[in-house]
Amino acid sequence: MRLIPRLLNFFYRHLYHGLAFTYDSVAAVVSFGHWTEWINETLPFIQGTRLLELGHGSGHLQRVLLDSSSSVNARSGLFVVGLDESSQMGRLAQRRIVRAGIASPRLTRGLAQALPFHADTFDSIVASFPAEYIVDPRTLSEANRVLRGGGRLIVMPAAWPKSRLLQWLYRVTGESPTEVVEIVKEKWSQHFIRAGFEVSVETLEVKSSVLLIVLARKLTEK
């Protein structure tokens, strides 16, 4: 029963490192071409001007955040940082952002479980389709530490295209997105609460897809 998780971990490890150059292609296939659209749906939930992206990957959201025409970038004093454990992803993101005409992106290599930032630094932290590290108590403790009081951790753990093929597969396999939503609500929420967050789990329907969003607000000290 543990074989599948091990295979998935092996796949993800290589996808983020030695096979990082295939990441965008794989993401496009598994999302039916909606990958960047899904990631951009986190933008309306971002608050404040000091932003951290955990697991910036190949830099799609970083590019949008730093685009001078974006609604987020219009905020005065915007400060955006991206963090990823993979040096290969760092190089891909750097190239993407520089090609977009942004001279000096703030990208750093590191672990979410040991963030290299001072306490109370960020207004928002965002993570799109993160691996299991996101519910590691060390990750959530670090996110709570570097967020300002009332700051927001935004996590998009899953999304589904509105596809007839997928609906058929759900019927055949007996599985459905509803099960994932319930797991996140019942199990993930407890991790966030124990780390000092007030948490809500929302499903967001857009034109082509259904997205799962976790919104965790850092509780302010009384």
Language-model-detected regions and their locations in the chain:
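Conserved beta-strand signature within the Rossmann-like core of class I S-adenosyl-L-methionine
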Residues: 151-158
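Short alpha-helix
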Residues: 180-196
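Core SAM-dependent methyltransferase catalytic element
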Residues: 196, 203-222
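A short SAM/SAH-binding and catalytic strip from SAM-dependent methyltransferases
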Residues: 124-135
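A short glycine-rich, Lys/Arg-flanked "PGG" loop and its adjoining helix->strand segment in the class I
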Residues: 138-149
